[in-house]
Amino acid sequence: VLSNNHPLARKSMITVKELKALPLILRSASSDTRNLFRAHLESHNMSLDDFNVILEIDNIGTIKNLVRREIGVSILSRSVCLDELKKGSLSVLPIENLSMVREINILYHRDFRHEDLLQTILKEYNKAIRNYAV
């Protein structure tokens, strides 16, 4: 995530090399998005120590404000930036060769007999996911 005024905001994608050169604002170590990013880096023999991390903040709103003010860039879920994307105040760029797709699992007891309810839940979930596409 970066400010719409950032020179890289016009690109369709950012590389890890470009990201390493930018001031990076991260969420706390307990953040799922941060952990997905960290896991991807580790799978490519990299770590967060390879980046210019300037702040770690747990408040998403504060991170977005700092990014808007061009203090740094961040790794955030696209879904938390929907309002800013619509307003044009932030840009969300995919990172080249980086997939941060979360796996969602639905568990239910083997004796559960309400398949119609499961189908309804899945339909609603899929509708909600489509609403996040910008």
Tell me the role of every PLM-derived stretch.
Residues 91-134:
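A late-sequence structural motif
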Residues 2-3, 27-28, 76:
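Thr-Gly-centered strand-to-loop micro-motif
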Residues 8-9, 23-45, 115-116, 132-133:
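Secondary-structure junction motif
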Residues 5-16, 111-117:
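Short helix-loop capping/hinge motifs at secondary-structure junctions, enriched
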Residues 1, 7, 23, 73, ...:
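Residues embedded in well-ordered beta-strands
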Residues 1-3, 12-20, 88, 95-103:
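Short Pro/Gly-enriched coil loops immediately N-terminal to beta-strands
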Residues 33, 38-90:
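Hydrophobic hinge/microswitch elements
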Residues 17, 64-65, 119:
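Alpha-helical segments flanking ligand/cofactor-binding loops in enzyme cores
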